Structures are given as structure tokens and as C-alpha cells.
């Protein structure tokens, strides 16, 4: 999979590389008021510990700007060297100019070309932000969004479209304007002297099919590393499915160097859900491994017992519980594949494909459960202690398979 990646320059955000041959980075964004130092620091730590490699926070006013250096200081005091991205709209040029310590504390600036102002002021504000980034050696993400397109650019492209022999739909022109907005800003930044190794590009929409078209165009027209994500994925299952549907085609084509899943969290749901989903998408596509994986069948009329479901749940829980210690002791354990299957139809075959797997008896089958490791029959379990015995075998397998080489 990694060999299919679209070639780009490498951009370092803090110590995290984006683009080139580097792993696709997982990002997230806080939803706390940045001016609230305690709450924002706590949420950045929570996101980072969940696996977010880069965290973005809004810098929308002077109080937020003043808070950024203290947030950074507290994170470092906790041993969290997580890169922080400042999200600027409307007044970013003013805040970066007035609060240099804030600018220094950030690891990347996000600039939306649609929220910089109008006319010549837009160009001046953009130029000032790029100059500050260059002076400090900071990378920039030019992040266009179809919800905040420059009206002048949209009007220009609508007028041009009206003169075509066969005009495109208004929706198609909006998507073209989104790409054009991002590309023009990217080219302007390069002309000002910002290096290719300091530029990341994004252009977000809220529909999966549209996102695929937009990013294929960005990949065709630029060499920049690309930040993928729907601008608003939505809540729950809908948001998860929409994000996976939008990102998977692009990632499988080698397009995309960092991702963020913009879920709307349900009341009381942790913000870290977006990190978990982003990791699951990358792992499902075989692009990264973050944690051991459990494969289990959905069940059917042959699996009248719920035991295989209970065992799959218990194995998943135990792997998650053991992962912090395993990571420290057994390099590569994130690659572990475990199968928990419910009957003889696919059970043995799926178990052989996993590192270690168990095929439980289905309805009418002999009450025994063969266990396979590395494609070979390891043992056959029987009786009441199958669950605990299988978990012990998994633990032993990890110690043997992933033990550091002497």
C-alpha cells in the first residue's frame, strides 16, 4: 500500500512529518474555548493520548492568542510534545502580528483563503501571515472550505461558466471554485518564497463523492501534501460511514498524507471518538497499524450460541487492556491479528489467516474448539474454560512472536 503513495515533499509539523513516504498522520481538533487554558490543555492531552499526532485549536480572539503559549508550556510539562496548529479566520494577520509568542508556540498555521477579507485587503492579509510563517520557519496549511468561498472568485467562475457552450451545473462550479481557491493561494505562497516543504493543502466539502473529485484535482494540479477530511461528517454511524466512504477511495489511490475525521460528538461522548475512527479507517485499509485486530463473524443460523460473541468481546477488551504494556515490551504487537469464529464453515480458514484464531463449535457441531497459530493447528480446547484458556494462549503467543530479538 505504501508504495502507491503520491510523491510529495515532506513537511514537518513539530516533529511529525507529513507527506513523502511517511505514515499518514492522524489529526484532531479541540472544541474547548482556547482562552480556557485548563480545559484546552486537558483536551489536547486527552486527544494526544488517544493517538492524535497533531492537534488543532482555534485562535479566534486576543484571549485565545494569549492562552496559546501557556497551553504549550503545560503540555511540555506533562511530557506531551504534541504539535499545535492554530486555526485562523478573519483576524489571523492581526493576532499573529500582535502576539509573537503565540505565533512561536504554534507548530503550524491554518489559513483559509476564503476568510481573509475582500479585494486587496485579502491579498495583504494573506501576505502578512505568510511572511510571519516564513520569518519563524513555520509550515502553513492552506485550507479552503466550500462553506466560506471568496464570493469574488465564485462570481468570476460562474460568469466564465455562463459563457461556455455547455455550462456546468452551479454545484460543479462551486467545486471548481473550491479547488481554484486552494491552488491560487498555494501558488501565491510559493511565489512569496514559502518553501514546498512548508506547505500543506486542503479543500473540504461535506459530501463523500464531492471530496473525492476535489482531491483528485488537487493531486493533479499540485505537489503539496494533502490533508483529507470532510468538513462536517455528522454524528454517530452516519458520520463514521461518510468519513470512511470519502477517505477510502483517495487513500487507496495514494492520495492523502494526513487525515482528520470531523465527527459531531453526541452529548457526553468523548472527543477522542474522532481519533479512534481515523485510526480504524487507516488500519482497515492496511495503511497503518495502531492496535491488535480481532476478526469475528457476524453469526447466522449455525451459531445458535452467543458464546462466540461474548468471547470476541472479551478478547477485544483484553487486548485493549494489555496494549499499553505490550507496546512497551513487544515491538510490532500492533500488527497482531486474532480471529474468533462461530462455526466450522469459515472458522478454521479465517483462524489460519490470523496470527492466532479459534473456531468455536456451531449448532450441531462437536463441542470442541480448534486453535490455530501461524496457520497451523496449535491445540483443541474443550469444556467450560475455553475463554480463559484461549486468552492465555493469546498472551503466550504475543510473548513468543513479538519478543525483542536478542
Swiss-Prot record:
A Pfam family recorded for this sequence: GcpE
Q: Which cofactor does it need?
A: [4Fe-4S] cluster
Q: State its Enzyme Commission number(s).
A: 1.17.7.3
- What UniProt keywords are attached to this protein's entry? 4Fe-4S, Iron, Iron-sulfur, Isoprene biosynthesis, Metal-binding, Oxidoreductase
Under the heading InterPro entries, the entry gives: Dihydropteroate_synth-like_sf, IspG_bac, IspG_bac-typ, NO2/SO3_Rdtase_4Fe4S_sf
Q: Which domain of life is it from?
A: Bacteria
Q: What class of enzyme is it?
A: oxidoreductase
Q: In which pathway does it act?
A: Isoprenoid biosynthesis; isopentenyl diphosphate biosynthesis via DXP pathway; isopentenyl diphosphate from 1-deoxy-D-xylulose 5-phosphate: step 5/6
Q: How, per the record, is the cofactor bound?
A: Binds 1 [4Fe-4S] cluster.
Could you tell me one molecular function GO term of this UniProt entry?
A: 4-hydroxy-3-methylbut-2-en-1-yl diphosphate synthase activity (ferredoxin)
Give the record's GO biological process terms.
Answer: isopentenyl diphosphate biosynthetic process, methylerythritol 4-phosphate pathway; terpenoid biosynthetic process
Substrates-to-products reaction catalysed? (2E)-4-hydroxy-3-methylbut-2-enyl diphosphate + oxidized [flavodoxin] + H2O + 2 H(+) = 2-C-methyl-D-erythritol 2,4-cyclic diphosphate + reduced [flavodoxin]
User: Which residues are recorded as binding [4Fe-4S] cluster?
Assistant: 297, 300, 343, 350
Which family would the database say this protein is a member of?
Answer: Belongs to the IspG family.
Q: What does this protein do?
A: Converts 2C-methyl-D-erythritol 2,4-cyclodiphosphate (ME-2,4cPP) into 1-hydroxy-2-methyl-2-(E)-butenyl 4-diphosphate.
Q: What is this protein called?
A: 4-hydroxy-3-methylbut-2-en-1-yl diphosphate synthase (flavodoxin)
Q: Which organism is it from?
A: Thermus thermophilus (strain ATCC 27634 / DSM 579 / HB8)
Amino acid at each position: 500500500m505504501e508504495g502507491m503513495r503520491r510523491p510529495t515533499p515532506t513537511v514537518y509539523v513539530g516533529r511529525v512529518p507529513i507527506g513523502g513516504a511517511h505514515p499518514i498522520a492522524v489529526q484532531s481538533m479541540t472544541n474547548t474555548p482556547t482562552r480556557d487554558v485548563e480545559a484546552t490543555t486537558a483536551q489536547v492531552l486527552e486527544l494526544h493520548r488517544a493517538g492524535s499526532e497533531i492537534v488543532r485549536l482555534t485562535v479566534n480572539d486576543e484571549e485565545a492568542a494569549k492562552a496559546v503559549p501557556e497551553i504549550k508550556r503545560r503540555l511540555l510539562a506533562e511530557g506531551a510534545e504534541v504539535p499545535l496548529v492554530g486555526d485562523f479566520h478573519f483576524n489571523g494577520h492581526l493576532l499573529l502580528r500582535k502576539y509573537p509568542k503565540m505565533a512561536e508556540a504554534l507548530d503550524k498555521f491554518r489559513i483559509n483563503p476564503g476568510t481573509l477579507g475582500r479585494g486587496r485587503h485579502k491579498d495583504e492579509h494573506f501576505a502578512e501571515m505568510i511572511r510571519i510563517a516564513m520569518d519563524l520557519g513555520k509550515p502553513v496549511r492552506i485550507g479552503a472550505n466550500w462553506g466560506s468561498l471568496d464570493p469574488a472568485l465564485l462570481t468570476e467562475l460562474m460568469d466564465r461558466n455562463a459563457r461556455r457552450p455547455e455550462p456546468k451545473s452551479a454545484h460543479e462550479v462551486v467545486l471548481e471554485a473550491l479547488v481554484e481557491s486552494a491552488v491560487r493561494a498555494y501558488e501565491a505562497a510559493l511565489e512569496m518564497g514559502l518553501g514546498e516543504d512548508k506547505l500543506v493543502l486542503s479543500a473540504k466539502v461535506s459530501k463523500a463523492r464531492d471530496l473525492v473529485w476535489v482531491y483528485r484535482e488537487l493531486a493533479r494540479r499540485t505537489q503539496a501534501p494533502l490533508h483529507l477530511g470532510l468538513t462536517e461528517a455528522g454524528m454517530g454511524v452516519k458520520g463514521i460511514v461518510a468519513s470512511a466512504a470519502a477517505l477510502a477511495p483517495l487513500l487507496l489511490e495514494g492520495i492523502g498524507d494526513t487525515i482528520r475525521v470531523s465527527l459531531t460528538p453526541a452529548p457526553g461522548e468523548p472527543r477522542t471518538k474522532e481519533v479512534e475512527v481515523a485510526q480504524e479507517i487507516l488500519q482497515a485499509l492496511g495503511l497503518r497499524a495502531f492496535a491488535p485486530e480481532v476478526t469475528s463473524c457476524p453469526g447466522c443460523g449455525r451459531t445458535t450460541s452467543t458464546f462466540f460473541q461474548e468471547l470476541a468481546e472479551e478478547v477485544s477488551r483484553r487486548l485493549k487492556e494489555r496494549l499499553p504494556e505490550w507496546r512497551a515490551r513487544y515491538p510490532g504487537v500492533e500488527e497482531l491479528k486474532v480471529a474468533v469464529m462461530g462455526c466450522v464453515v469459515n472458522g478454521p480458514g479465517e483462524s489460519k489467516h490470523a496470527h492466532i484464531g479459534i473456531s468455536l463449535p456451531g449448532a450441531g457441531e462437536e463441542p470442541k474448539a480448534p486453535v490455530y497459530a501461524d496457520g497451523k493447528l496449535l491445540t483443541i480446547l474443550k469444556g467450560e474454560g475455553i475463554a480463559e484458556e484461549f486468552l492465555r494462549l493469546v498472551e503466550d503467543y504475543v510473548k513468543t512472536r513479538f519478543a525483542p530479538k536478542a
